[in-house]
Structure formats: structure tokens, C-alpha cells
A protein has these predicted regions:
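Composition-driven low-complexity segments enriched in polar/acidic and proline residues
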Residues: 1-350, 479-507
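Extended, amphipathic alpha-helical scaffolds
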Residues: 335, 362-363, 376-377
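A short, highly charged nucleic-acid-interacting micro-segment common to nuclease
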Residues: 341-363, 367-368, 433-438
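Active-site metal-binding core of divalent-cation-utilizing nuclease and nuclease-like domains
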Residues: 376-411
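Active-site beta-strand-loop-beta-strand hairpin of nuclease catalytic cores
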Residues: 405-425
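Catalytic cores of nucleic-acid endonucleases
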Residues: 420-479
Length: 507
């Protein structure tokens, strides 16, 4: 990449995150208004969306195809490296979203590009503002009822006015930075060995899942682990780096990429990895959703692969996290893999259940570490996923208490429900009200049974003799990840839960 292109890319990055760009944004908004012949009022959002998309396609043809793809990679790479983690100051899109849009438009449409053109900063800024505007209009149509109403020129460029949107990125940062179940550790050596013996640690669960995921996508988690370790070394050793100073972006012949790893991963598996990561392959298979494209990061042209090192590492890491629980398998798999996906549907459910059970052991150990009594099995290990308890010769059916604990300071039985949420990949997933009242019916039934048998349960499970009148029952939900669901019960994400225990706060 020459010096002029570098300067333009840096200028674009600063522009995207809002540094001194307000006047130019207003100028470009005025140009869009004029080009699309938008009147002062009675504007239809869906009509604007269609017209603007066509306008973007017309504008993007004026650029050099490879330079656009490089810019898209650079944006996504910078977001992966958290060099530019900031959302646009006045918009909903991020540099990651803009990079995905550009890749999708360039590779997913039969366009005749002006490949002899040079990067033009004002034209690029205008194109990006059009993409931002398009994303904003789509957001309004999808997440508000405004698409059934007319809007004015002054209003059309404003982002969605919603408290959830205002707080989205602050909460999303907490979500991204929170520890994942796959990374949670058991500190008790005896319990850790027990879980290893029964194949219930994340490492063991991944080992068991290897043949399942390999049969579905054609490569396995061992391959992913090796690539996660080895790919960063490519920017130090390959002679195909597109920019020796930057070292983040690599152009390499497809056969050379395969040759770089084939001593450790079979050629067949490597070919399938490249198919999975290829944006071209994704679009050709009919996957055009931004979130589906986001899972991929390699662009192909005449046998040459182009990608950003940090982004390929992030995409592989995301693949490993979301597939172990069977989440987003429709987005991960291609059309020709659907039969294998259906064949292994039960296996994927078992993997999720195993990871959820491991989560129960982690939470139970935390309770005990901070002075709570916990239900234990005959061998002295935490008794999780409790189905029933025998009290005075009678069997009390609970079906599934994830963790049962007792606070000796307040004489409170803690009925703990765990939610192992799938990774949320977009705004809709983060804000969807998935936890309706019915989701808690079983939890409330268990709570009622506990309240009706308080002293007997405390005696049988925790070995304490305390009268009913002195015992309270509290139900809480601990989620593996941050979420924005409407709550009708006390709920903590895992980080909040740990902090509560650490500070000896009442749950």
C-alpha cells in the first residue's frame, strides 16, 4: 500500500469515528437529499431504503475493487484489534458494520468497477455516509413502527431515538468483556479432577464434540486451535504481506496458504476451513445477511486470498464459541451441509446441556467459596440439576434446580436458575425480550415447593434445624452473559453475581 493510500485510509478511519466530520456529514446528507429528490415531508422509509441502495451500487462502481476490499478488511481488522472500538458518534453503525457492507456489496453484486481509479477521499466519505444512512434507515424500519408513518427531512438522518439504543454500546462493552462459560475455571482440584473424569470440563466437551463438528463442516476444533495459534505467525514469516510496515493484512496464494499448514492439518480440512471463512463462498451460497458475512473474513480473487490476521483469528474464535452449544448453526453451515446438521441435532443439544451443567458446577463452587452451604451428592460433590428431594418419606419433584444454596447469615434458601445464553451477534439479539413470563413458570413452581417445605428441606439438604418462620426463600437467575431481556425476577449476569459474593452483598 503506497503512502497516499495509507493517508486516505487513516483519514477515513478518523472520519468514521466522528473526529471533526460534522460539517462534511451535513454536506453529504444534503447531497443525498438532492440526489434522491427527497421532499420536505411524507417520506416513506422503505422507498428511501430501496432508492439509497441503488444509489450506493451506482457510486461504488467508481472505485478500484481491490482498494475497496482492502479498506473493508482494514476497518474490520481495526475493530477486531479494538484500535477503533468506538461507535459512530451520531449513528448506529460501527466501522465493523461499514467494512461488512463494503465487502458484501463488492463481492455480492455483478458490478463493473473502475479499477484504474485512485482512492478519492471526498468520494469515499460520501460513499460511507450513504452506507451509514442506509444502515440507519434499515434500523428504523426493523426496530420501530416508524416505517408505517411519514417522516421529515430533518428527522430522517437522526438515529433511532430509544433509551436502549443510547445505552447499547456501554452494555455491549460489558457483554463482550465478560468471561465466557468456556473460560470459567474450577479452583477446587478434587472437583476439577472429578469433572475431568466424567468428561465435563470445557476441554473434555470440545474433545467429545470434535467428530460431530467435523462431520458437519469438514474440520474440527483441534484444527481451529492450531490455526488460532499459528495464523498470527504468518505475518512474520510470509513474503506475501500486502504491507510490511502494517503486517496486519496478508495476500497469499490459496495453495501457499494450504502448504503453510498442511504438515499439521490435512489438506481436506484446510480446504473446508477456507470454504467456511470465504466471504465469496458465503455470498455464492445465498448468505447475504450482515451477521452471516461477519462470521467470514477471507476474500478470494483468481486464487489469491486476502485477509486481516486479527480478523481471521477473531472469526475462528467466534466459530469455536458458538458451535460448541449448537447456536447459530444455520448461519455457520452452508446449504450442502444441512443434512449433516439435521443428523447431529441431538448431539448439539447434548453439547449445550453439558456446558450448562459445567456452568452449574462453577456457580455452586462460587457459592461454597463465599460461605454459602450448597446441596451435595453422596460423594461430597456439588449436587446440581436436582430432580427431586426425599422429605419425610415423600418425594418432592423439582425437575431441575440448577443450584440450591443456603445463606446462614440470613437463613435464606437460594433457588438458583442458570441461563446459558447464546452469543448475541446484533442489536436485535441483544435487546429482544426473549424471557417472557412462561420462561419462569417452572422456577416459580420450584420456589413454591421450597416455601411449603422450608424447614424439612434445610434439615435434609443442609443438616440444620431451623423453624419455618425463620427461613426465607429467594429465587435468582444467573446468566452466563449480559443480556437485555425484560426481567420479572432478580437476575444477575455472571460478573455481577461474582461481585455480589465478593462484597458479601445480599442476593
Amino acid at each position: 500500500m503506497d503512502q497516499k493510500t495509507k493517508e486516505i485510509v487513516n483519514n477515513i478511519m478518523n472520519y468514521v469515528i466522528g473526529k471533526g466530520a460534522s460539517d462534511e456529514i451535513k454536506k453529504n446528507q444534503h447531497s443525498v437529499t438532492k440526489t434522491l429528490s427527497l421532499s420536505a415531508d411524507n417520506l416513506c422509509l422503505e422507498s428511501i431504503e430501496n432508492d439509497l441502495w441503488q444509489h450506493i451500487l451506482d457510486r461504488i462502481k467508481c472505485f478500484n475493487r481491490d482498494e475497496l476490499l482492502f479498506l473493508a478488511e482494514f476497518m474490520r481488522e481495526s475493530f477486531s484489534a479494538r484500535l477503533y472500538p468506538v461507535a459512530l458518534l451520531y449513528q448506529f453503525a460501527t466501522i465493523n458494520d461499514i467494512g461488512i457492507y463494503i465487502s458484501k456489496i463488492v463481492l455480492g453484486n455483478e458490478l463493473l468497477f473502475n479499477n484504474r481509479s485512485c482512492m478519492d477521499l471526498p468520494k469515499l466519505k460520501y460513499l460511507i455516509d450513504c452506507i451509514i444512512f442506509y444502515d440507519n434507515v434499515k434500523t428504523k424500519i426493523e426496530y420501530t413502527k416508524r416505517n408505517t408513518l411519514s417522516v421529515t427531512i430533518d428527522d430522517i438522518f437522526e438515529p433511532v431515538k430509544n433509551e436502549v439504543v443510547d445505552n447499547f454500546f456501554q452494555g455491549y462493552a460489558l457483554y463482550l468483556n465478560s468471561i465466557k462459560v468456556e473460560d470459567m475455571e474450577i479452583s477446587n482440584p478434587k472437583l476439577r479432577q472429578y469433572l475431568t473424569d466424567i468428561h465435563l470440563t470445557p476441554d473434555e466437551i470440545y474433545k467429545q464434540a470434535n467428530p460431530v463438528i467435523e462431520d458437519i463442516v469438514g474440520f474440527n476444533y483441534d484444527d481451529v486451535d492450531y490455526l488460532l495459534y499459528k495464523v498470527p505467525y504468518m505475518m512474520l514469516n510470509t513474503t506475501y504481506s500486502s504491507d510490511r510496515e502494517n503486517r496486519f493484512h496478508i495476500k497469499i496464494m490459496r495453495n501457499d496458504f494450504i502448504g503453510y499448514f498442511k504438515d499439521y492439518i490435512s489438506e481436506e480440512h484446510l480446504i473446508n476451513v477456507l470454504k467456511y471463512l470465504s466471504i465469496n463462498h458465503c455470498l455464492n451460497d445465498g448468505k447475504h445477511n450482515n451477521r452471516e458475512v461477519e462470521l467470514r473474513c477471507i476474500t478470494e480473487n483468481d486464487g489469491v486470498l486476502s485477509f486481516a490476521v486479527r480478523t481471521i483469528v477473531e472469526c475462528l474464535g467466534i466459530f469455536k464459541r458458538i458451535t460448541i452449544t449448537g447456536h447459530y448453526m444455520d448461519e455457520v453451515t452452508y446449504s450442502y451441509q444441512k443434512s449433516k446438521l439435521e443428523l447431529h441435532s441431538t448431539d448439539l443439544i447434548k453439547q449445550q446441556q453439558s456446558m450448562s451443567t459445567y456452568f452449574s458446577y462453577v456457580v455452586a463452587e462460587l457459592f461454597e467459596s463465599y460461605g454459602y452451604l450448597i446441596a451435595k451428592d453422596a460423594n461430597g460433590y456439588p449436587d446440581v440439576d436436582i430432580k427431586d428431594i426425599i422429605v419425610n418419606g415423600s418425594r418432592l419433584v423439582f425437575n431441575d434446580i440448577d443450584v440450591l444454596a443456603f445463606d446462614r447469615n440470613t437463613n435464606t434458601i437460594i433457588n438458583c436458575e442458570l441461563k446459558y445464553y447464546k452469543v448475541k451477534m446484533d442489536y436485535a439479539g441483544m435487546t429482544k425480550d426473549a424471557l417472557n413470563k412462561e420462561k419462569y413458570e417452572s422456577l416459580f413452581k420450584r420456589e413454591t415447593t421450597l416455601k411449603n417445605n422450608k424447614s424439612a428441606i434445610v434439615k435434609v439438604v443442609f443438616g440444620l434445624t431451623i423453624p419455618d418462620s425463620s427461613i426465607e426463600v429467594k429465587s435468582i437467575v444467573v446468566t452466563s452473559r449480559q443480556n437485555y431481556n425484560t426481567k420479572n425476577i432478580t437476575e444477575y449476569n455472571f460478573e455481577e453475581f461474582k461481585r455480589k459474593l465478593l462484597n458479601n452483598e445480599t442476593l
